[in-house]
Amino acid sequence: MLLQNFSNTIFLLCLFFTLLSATKPLNLTLPHQHPSPDSVALHVIRSVNESLARRQLSSPSSSSSSSSSSSSSSCRTGNPIDDCWRCSDADWSTNRQRLADCSIGFGHGTLGGKNGKIYVVTDSSDNNPTNPTPGTLRYGVIQEEPLWIVFSSNMLIRLKQELIINSYKTLDGRGSAVHITGNGCLTLQYVQHIIIHNLHIYDCKPSAGFEKRGRSDGDGISIFGSQKIWVDHCSMSHCTDGLIDAVMGSTAITISNNYFTHHDEVMLLGHDDNYAPDTGMQVTIAFNHFGQGLVQRMPRCRRGYIHVVNNDFTEWKMYAIGGSGNPTINSQGNRYSAPSDPSAKEVTKRVDSKDDGEWSNWNWRTEGDLMENGAFFVASGEGMSSMYSKASSVDPKAASLVDQLTRNAGVFGGPRDDQGQSGNSYSPYGGDGGGGGSSGGSSGGGMDVMGGTTRGSSSSSGDDSNVFQMIFGSDAPSRPRLTLLFSLLMISVLSLSTLLL
C-alpha cells in the first residue's frame, strides 16, 4: 500500500512539473502589450525629430529643388502622422488606406480595415439598431470582415443606441463633414484594430440598452477590453461621461491630433486601482489640443504606462493629468498653460492619495515641457530607468513647436471648434495632400472591392518600417488558460492528499 501511494505521488509530481513547464513563462500580459514601453516612447520622439528635419530640409529657403519638392515642403508640418498620409506623391483620396501606415506610439500597426473593401455610408439614419439598413453606418460597423468605411457626403448621424463596432474597421471621415451624436455613441468592446479618423463626436447621452445590453454611460468613445485602437483627428465635446474612456485591459492605443473642448471628465484610462490587468495598459497621447471649457482628466490614469507628448493644454479648471494605482506617466515636450485660479496651477494630481508617502515611488516624469502662467508639474519616482536614460539622449522637440505640431488638431480642414461643434459645414482640405469630396468608393451603399492584397500586408510602409518591426515583435507569450491553472491546482491537492494517506 505504501509503495502504491509512493508511486502515485511520483506520477502526480511528474505530471505537475510537466504541465508547469508547459506554461513557462507563466504571465498575465495583455495581447499587444509591449515588453519595453520606454523604447516605444523613444521611437515617437525620434519620429517627430526626423519629420521636423525633413520639413526643414525640403523648405524653399534650404533648397532650390523642383516644384514637386516645393509642393511637398508646403504640405509638411513636422507632424509625423500628417506628413505621412498628406505629403506623399499621390493625392490622399486615391490611396486612403495609406493612413493605416501612419500611426505612431503604442497604437502603431493598427490596421483598421486595411486591405479590406470600401464601404460607403449613403444613409445617415439609424432607425433600426437591431436590424440596420444597408448603406447606414451601423450596418457597416457590424460586419465581420475588414472594411474601410467612408461617407458619400456631409451628414449628421443621430444614434438611437450605442454604435457597437466590430474588429478591423476604419471610420474615415476625410472629404466630408461627418457629425455623430445621440445615444451611446461609439463602443469598442473586446475588439482589435480600429481606426477612428476625422469625425465630429459630441452631445453623447446614455442609452437604455437594446437586446441583452445594459445602459451605456454616454461616452464619446468607449474602449472596453480592446487593443490596437487609434483615434486621430476627431473633434469631441459635451458628452455625459467621458470623451474617451479606455478600461478593462485595453492597451496598444494611440490618441492623436484631436481637439477636445467643453467637457468635465475628458479621458479615463483604467477604471479600478485594484484591476491588475490594467498594469499592461499602454497609451500614447500625442499632438492633441486640450482647449476651452475643460475641467479635469486629460487623462486620469490607473496603472499602466501613459506617454503624453507634444500636446497643447490651454485650459483646465482642476488639473490636467491625474492618476492613482501607481501608473507611469511620461510627459515630454508639452505646453501647459495654467488657469488664473491660484489653487489650480498644478498640472498633476494624485487622486485619492493622502500624502506623498503613498505616491513618492510612482514614476511621473517631465522632460522638455513648457510651463506657462505659473503651471508646475510634480514629478516623482525613479529619476530614470536605464532605457529612459537612453531615451532622454534624444531630446524631445521643444514645446515651443507645439503650435506647429498641433496646428491641424481636430477634424482636418474644418473650422476650429471652440464651442464644441461647428454645425454641418465643411471646409475643403488645404495643402497639397487635399482632394476634398472624393469618397473613394462606389456611389451606392454597398461594398466595392479595393485592391488584391490580403489583410496584414503592407502596401506602403514608411522609412521606419524595419525599426517598427523590431520594436513591435510578437514575442510576448500567450496568456495561460484558466482550465490549465485549475488542473495544476487539482494536481497539487491530489498530491498532498496522497502524501497524507
Curated annotation (Swiss-Prot):
Ca(2+) binds at D217, D241, D245. Glycans are attached at N27, N49. Gene3D superfamilies: Single-stranded right-handed beta-helix, Pectin lyase-like. Residues 343-357 have a biased composition (Basic and acidic residues). Residues 430-449 have a biased composition (Gly residues). SMART domains: Amb_all. Belongs to the polysaccharide lyase 1 family. Expressed equally in mature leaves, buds, flowers, rosettes and roots. One of its GO terms (biological process) is cell wall modification involved in multidimensional cell growth. Binds 1 Ca(2+) ion. Required for its activity. GO terms for molecular function: metal ion binding; pectate lyase activity. Residues 1-22 form the signal peptide. This is Probable pectate lyase 13. Pathway: Glycan metabolism; pectin degradation; 2-dehydro-3-deoxy-D-gluconate from pectin: step 2/5. Its main location: membrane. InterPro entries: AmbAllergen, Pec_lyase, Pectin_lyas_fold, Pectin_lyase_fold/virulence, PEL. Keywords: Calcium, Cell membrane, Glycoprotein, GPI-anchor, Lipoprotein, Lyase, Membrane, Metal-binding, Signal. Its EC number is 4.2.2.2. Pfam families: Pectate_lyase_4 (PF00544). The active site is at R297.
